[in-house]
From Swiss-Prot:
Its main location: nucleus. Belongs to the RRM CWC2 family. It is found in: Nucleus. Residues 186-265 form the RRM domain. SMART domains: RRM. This is Pre-mRNA-splicing factor CWC2. Pfam families: RRM_1 (PF00076), Torus (PF16131). Residues 307-358 are annotated as: Disordered. GO terms for cellular component: post-mRNA release spliceosomal complex; Prp19 complex; U2-type catalytic step 1 spliceosome; U2-type catalytic step 2 spliceosome. The C-terminal RRM domain and the zinc finger motif are necessary for RNA-binding. Involved in the first step of pre-mRNA splicing. Required for cell growth and cell cycle control. Plays a role in the levels of the U1, U4, U5 and U6 snRNAs and the maintenance of the U4/U6 snRNA complex. May provide the link between the 'nineteen complex' NTC spliceosome protein complex and the spliceosome through the U6 snRNA. Associates predominantly with U6 snRNAs in assembled active spliceosomes. Binds directly to the internal stem-loop (ISL) domain of the U6 snRNA and to the pre-mRNA intron near the 5' splice site during the activation and catalytic phases of the spliceosome cycle. Associated with the spliceosome.
Amino acid sequence: MSEAPESIETSPVVTPDVAESVQNQGVEVVQTEAPTEAQVVKTKSKKKRTKDPALYHTRKARIQVDPDSVNTDDRPPQTGTVYNIWFNKWSGGDKEDEKFNQKKADGRCSIARDSGYTRADKVPGSYFCLYFARGLCTQGHKCEFLHRLPVLTDMFSPTTDCFGRDRFFDYRDDMGGIGSISRVNRTLYVGRIHVSDAAKAGALDEIVSRHFSEWGDVDRIRVLHDKGVAFVTYATEVNAQFAKEAMAHQSLDSGEVLNVRWATQDPDPLAQAREQRRLEENAAEAIKRLLPQEYVDELEGRAKKSKPLLEGYEEDDSEKLKRIMNNQKEAGAEPAEEVKQIEPAPEPAAPVSTDTGMFNKSSLSALKALKKKKKTKAKVEE
């Protein structure tokens, strides 16, 4: 008996008439490498949205939640007289440890997908969007708050957090809430972490780092495996404030509901000294980024002197900054800061001098003449 021929899978064949009609409908026809005139029909793929959070200023902020799907009356049972939208509770009512507040969060922010520019980027000193951090913003690029991660140069008043909420002197008894103005706190307490078999094998540190490093630079992470607790320290306090709201009532990889609080102060003197040193470094780095780069190079000794100065004269910092901003004005660049000067009115008989400041042409000429006179007098005495 002869064997049955094996079935051969072939690509669908499209005639030229069908191919032309398909192209008119917005479908791309790709020529195959076969010697025949068979063609494969393939739909056009949509352009993917960039997921680089550093390019947030080149794209519009994404609407995280459809406004029509938001229930405006989604509130906890009324136990007070005034409803606080910031804390999702009634004044004098339920605590955060009750069952209602321990449910998993309705949304989660994704910096790579959701960040973008909003109306707030045009307003200096704008605050960050609290609902964006929670993944529940319905405004998108029309929002009046920032939709991005905080950076080192984002500085706010000590009496408010990065979302514009008022802070108080003392922490709450449960170390929750907005925080305190009594000290700079960069460390978060993360509780109720589910310790699975994989976590016991040593993967819990990687899991915590992967979830919390999305909200900014992390200095260190300490995980207590036997208690299901972690302490996450960020590089800046604003990143810790953002991460606290972003990870509140979220889960890691096991579906748990996290308990995120502010960490208490470490009593170790070495840890306190390390914290103080880190805060000073952050302040110096923030000031360095706000100053002109040429000025920073001169302060750190990396720049060459643009012109020779008089012997024995050392230019102070204010004169350096004025000279650098004058150079930026001459080059057509926008100066970092406007320096206001009061110039004396020119004499009618003398031409108007374009030089300003203490060491103009006439002053330098007088100093050179005085220096030459002193040298001549010293030679005569010898």
